[in-house]
Regions:
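N-terminal helix-turn-helix DNA-binding core of bacterial DNA-binding proteins
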Residues: 3-34
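Solvent-exposed interaction patches of small proteins and small membrane subunits
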Residues: 25, 31, 56, 65, ...
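Compact, glycine-rich, soluble single-domain proteins
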Residues: 31-34, 40, 68-70
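Basic amphipathic alpha-helical segments that dock to polyanions
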Residues: 39-49
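Beta-hairpin "wing" of winged helix-turn-helix
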Residues: 49-65
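Non-DNA-binding regulatory cores of transcription-related proteins
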Residues: 65-143
Length: 143
């Protein structure tokens, strides 16, 4: 599983919005070093996923519209359109020619178990904790 650049940018946008204030796209792009055209694309997804609210006009801007304590990294990845599977055979509807010919696949079973553990770990990490967590990047005990 890899967190794409798009999800990385989404996390950076949410980090700016942690203060509860409205921010312009230009400000967020400059602060978080996100190309402006990508920021707009990402904000559309975050807005469609009800994570942020975007208002237009002179007093417009972007602000959080979700509870970051109740929203997980797994949720964000879903909003961004990431399936987050370890292997293509984990995709829904994937037809494995090997399993069709030979039956049960031990590799698939082991990867499925790892996939479940990974999904559980990503579900257990709130966005607030991820974005505002402690100062030691090696310490994941509180996550």
């Amino acid at each position: 599983m890899i967190i794409t650049k798009e999800t990385d940018y989404a996390l950076r946008i949410l980090r700016v919005l942690l203060d509860g204030e409205k921010h312009s796209v230009a400000e967020m792009s400059e602060t978080e070093l996100i190309p402006t055209q990508f920021a707009y694309q990402i904000l559309r997804k975050l807005s469609a996923g009800n994570l942020v609210r975007v208002s237009r006009g002179a007093l417009g801007g972007c602000e959080l519209s979700c509870d970051l304590d109740a929203t997980s990294l797994y949720d964000l990845m879903g909003v961004m359109g990431e399936r987050g599977v370890l292997c293509a055979c984990m995709e829904p509807g994937f037809e494995c020619r090997w399993q069709d010919k030979h039956g049960r696949c031990a590799i698939h079973c082991q990867l499925a178990a790892l996939q479940r553990k990974q999904d559980e770990a990503f579900c257990a990490v709130s966005l607030r904790k991820l974005l505002a967590g402690g100062s030691d990047p090696q310490d994941t005990s509180e996550m």
